[in-house]
Amino acid sequence: MAELKNVKGAKLADPVGASIDPGTQELIALAQKLGIDTVFDRAAQMKPCAIGIQGICCKNCAMGPCRLPLPKGGIEGKDTRKGLCGATANTIAARNFIRMIAGGAAAHSDHGRCVAEVFLSAARKETDAYKIKDPNKLLAIAPWFDVATTVDVDGAAQDRNIDEIALEVAEKALNEWGKAEGELRYLKRAPAPLYEKWAKTGVLPRNIDREIVEIMHRTHMGVDQDYKNLMKQGTRASLADGWGGSMLATDLQDVLFGTPYPLQAEANLGVMKEDHVNIIVHGHEPVLS
């Protein structure tokens, strides 16, 4: 197919190559016809930074930015590239990568914190907008927080009040973001051999926020220069995200809004109506309700 260009001569995206969806293809072509700039056209026009794509540009201090591009002929012998502070290409790449991990973990985990705060508010009966919709899921996750679901009465086990269980789970769940000691509770959900491997390599997260903060600390100028140690902290923060903030958000949302189940629905650009004001809500933040 011939290269597409707009009236100014800028390269345009091929609608068929940009998306497999016919509706999206149609609207990309329409946007181009109307002269509307889209992400697809900008991607076709913009050449990625050759140094940035290798992760070897450091902007962590005011002496830089330092660029350590690979020589065109490659590296023969020892890699002697260093930034002004002495950071190697490996160190710079590791710093940049784990800062991206910190950003992603912060976004995921702060979503989970918001859910936990709403859950706590619902458990305290501070709002009528949210209630426990899936008590069975609450009973299923309670043991992971060392919350008893039954109480002994005259030698017989009786079910505890669901509101009492919810309040105790909520308080302990919210504590996972900033507790001073121990490790994340949900780590024990992993298969035992995997958990032991995490413990042996020293990457068990202590709490969610601490691992994100420690990445920002270690990647600051004059702190950690060992790329292996930096990547180790990146692993720890990733586990804090996946087995902490994200998993807590999933479970608490299930309790608050009901555990999801498969359903059939229509979803595409064709659901929009020409004679209506179309409002599209996108995302996975149910507490916006």
Predicted regions and their residues:
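Metallocofactor- and cofactor-centric catalytic cores in central/energy metabolism, strongly enriched
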Residues: 2-289
